[in-house]
A protein has these predicted regions:
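Metallocofactor- and cofactor-centric catalytic cores in central/energy metabolism, strongly enriched
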Residues: 1-66, 71-76, 93-108, 113, ...
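Conserved thiamine diphosphate
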Residues: 77-95
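Conserved anion/nucleotide-ligand pocket segment
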Residues: 111-138, 289-307
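Long, internal scaffold/assembly segments composed of regular secondary structure
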Residues: 184-258, 264-267
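A glycine-rich phosphate-binding loop feature that marks nucleotide/adenosyl-phosphate handling sites
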Residues: 218-225, 276-291
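Catalytic phosphate/nucleotide-handling subdomain of diverse soluble enzymes
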Residues: 255, 259-262, 267-286
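Conserved small/polar residues in nucleotide/adenosyl-binding loops
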Residues: 314-321
Length: 321
């Protein structure tokens, strides 16, 4: 908490903010001005920032004469100054309020700030190329760079080599035990757990060795057409386990999908799954389960699908994963 009334105060406040380890900033305008120093604070702060402002509290007892406490015009001037400086800041739809209202605005800013910070510290690791004819999974990397997201594109062959190099890894038995405990009655193919554990360790080691200076990682991986025949399994279960660890994994080298999953994870503080618009709803299902219960026509509905990255937390039966 600091009062900024001059450019010198701004520098001092910025140092205090850095010492405190803050990675997001809310600039609260308690009265009109000073727009230059307050917007300079936002300019020089390296992280997500928002602006809110005080509203008048009462007209009684000279509240609008000697008791002014409003920053309505100050917010207007500050927003103009931010634009002049090309400073991007979050301003709520109605950014002026009393203490409780401003606190609510700050609370609403938290997931936004988390998403911005996380994207600034994200690397997407892909293993491709995407399957033939899956043009929907095309992902020009320019837009990732525009979001300050790093990407490392790898060959599926590189991943296969790393997987083979992890054969007999001493950590495999412990991972198998963890999988057995997690799957319970859903452990329908115990004979492949060793390979799945080997693959999970391969990915985690790859992340550790390749994340570089980035704090977070998401993966866009491949699961077909040659994956199953060459690796000897499908990776869905491992992908779901990584997703539960906070490392979202998308299929079909869907890089933008991995980015979407990552944002969802950060904003929700929870594991996410990616649901594709896949196919139409059959007339009989519509008649039995939707018509009369919801205000939708058949043409308003669709079936969503994804091929297995939903973690066990969100399945009714382990066999569904």
């Amino acid at each position: 908490v600091c009062i900024v009334e001059s450019e010198i105060h701004m520098v001092q406040a910025l140092e205090d903010i850095k010492k405190a380890g803050c990675n997001a900033l809310c600039v609260y305008l308690g009265n009109f001005g000073p727009e230059i120093s307050e917007t300079l604070l936002a300019k020089h702060f390296d992280g997500p920032k928002m602006f809110v402002a005080a509203a008048e509290e009462t007209s009684k007892d000279g509240g609008l004469v000697q008791g002014r406490g409003d920053a309505y015009c100050g917010m207007l001037n500050a927003s103009y100054n931010l634009k002049l400086r090309n400073v991007k800041a979050y301003i709520p739809e109605y950014p002026v309020g009393n203490a409780e209202e401003c606190a609510d605005m700050i609370h609403e800013f938290v997931p936004i700030a988390k998403a911005i910070y996380a994207l600034d510290h994200l690397k997407i690791i892909s293993f491709g190329p995407r399957p033939l004819n899956f043009l929907a999974c095309n992902a020009p990397i320019q837009q990732l760079y525009n979001l300050n997201v790093e990407i490392e594109e790898n060959s599926e062959l590189d991943l296969f080599e790393a997987f083979n190099n992890h054969a007999g890894d001493a950590r495999i038995p412990d991972v198998v035990k963890d999988m057995e405990a997690e799957l319970g009655a859903g452990n329908k193919k115990p004979e492949i757990l060793e390979k799945l554990a080997q693959y999970e360790i391969t990915l985690l080691d790859w992340i550790e060795d390749h994340k570089g200076y980035r704090e977070f990682v998401a993966i866009a991986g491949k699961c077909w057409p040659a994956f199953q025949t060459q690796f000897g399994f499908v990776p869905c279960y491992v992908n779901s386990r990584l997703t539960k660890m906070g490392i979202p994994v998308s299929c079909e080298v869907d890089i933008y999908g991995a980015l979407s999953e990552f944002i969802g994870t950060v904003v929700s503080n929870d594991a996410v799954t990616l649901l594709d618009i896949n196919n139409t709803v059959t007339p009989d299902i519509y008649e039995e389960d939707i018509k009369g219960k919801f205000d939708y026509t058949l043409k308003d509905t669709f079936m969503g699908f994804h091929c297995g990255n939903t973690c066990l937390l969100y399945t009714s039966d382990a066999a569904d994963d």
